[in-house]
């Protein structure tokens, strides 16, 4: 008698009819957890980081390799994007100034710095970069947009392709001596702040729309 994955009998199969007999334990799941699944996103790519002192500067190198998927990251809706954040602080918790390297673009979220904007998910202007497929609506010129059903034009696309590696470097000014703590985070965001804020969607990291994909801390003496 045929049995299912839980060992229970399958009684609706006619002998010799209805297809090829297979061991249920060998049939892979066809579930699609999607972009709300933390475990899926946190096993999508490999991040490697290094930090070293060069005179009065701290040089941070970040490598991201899309080695665990067969498609671009992020994929599906053009609303989705990734934010790479690179922080360097002294022993007093003061942020070191970025002297060379990329910063998160405006659509990473512009907030009120007096209210600790970065802690609320407004990352525009911070050391790091973003990965996204940017579209512009041809009639309204709204960009970035996720309304791909409207007439749109491709502005840029720097998403991480399958098996591709992105390497970026960031140089921070620092005292010639003294400990420096470097923190690197890769955040998956499911919608732009310009859309999420008016709708009241939750954005805080670890919430419904922001998922922490990778994180690493380094200490430079």
Give the ranges of each region predicted by the language model:
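Primarily the internal scaffold of c-type cytochrome electron-transfer domains
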Residues: 1-161, 168-174, 185-221
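Exposed beta-strand face motif in extracellular beta-rich ectodomains
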Residues: 178-182
């Amino acid at each position: 008698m045929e049995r299912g994955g839980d060992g229970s009998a399958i009684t609706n199969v006619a002998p010799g009819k209805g297809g090829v007999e297979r061991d249920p334990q060998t049939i892979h799941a066809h579930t699609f957890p999607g972009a709300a699944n933390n475990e899926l996103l946190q096993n999508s790519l490999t991040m490697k980081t290094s930090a070293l002192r060069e005179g009065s500067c701290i040089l941070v190198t970040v490598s991201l390799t899309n080695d665990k998927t067969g498609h671009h990251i992020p994929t599906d809706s053009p609303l989705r994007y990734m934010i790479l954040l690179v922080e360097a602080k002294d022993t007093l918790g003061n942020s070191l100034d970025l002297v060379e390297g990329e910063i998160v673009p405006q659509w990473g979220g512009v907030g009120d710095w007096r209210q600790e904007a970065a802690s609320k998910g407004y990352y525009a202007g911070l050391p790091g970069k973003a990965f996204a497929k940017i579209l512009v609506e041809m009639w309204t010129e709204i960009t970035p947009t996720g309304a791909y059903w409207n007439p749109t034009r491709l502005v840029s696309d720097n998403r991480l392709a399958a098996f591709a590696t992105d390497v970026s470097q960031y140089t921070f000014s620092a005292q010639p001596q003294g400990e420096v703590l470097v923190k690197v985070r890769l955040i998956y965001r499911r919608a732009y702040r310009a859309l999420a804020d008016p709708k009241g969607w939750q954005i805080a990291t670890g919430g419904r729309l922001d998922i922490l994909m990778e994180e690493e801390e380094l200490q430079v003496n």
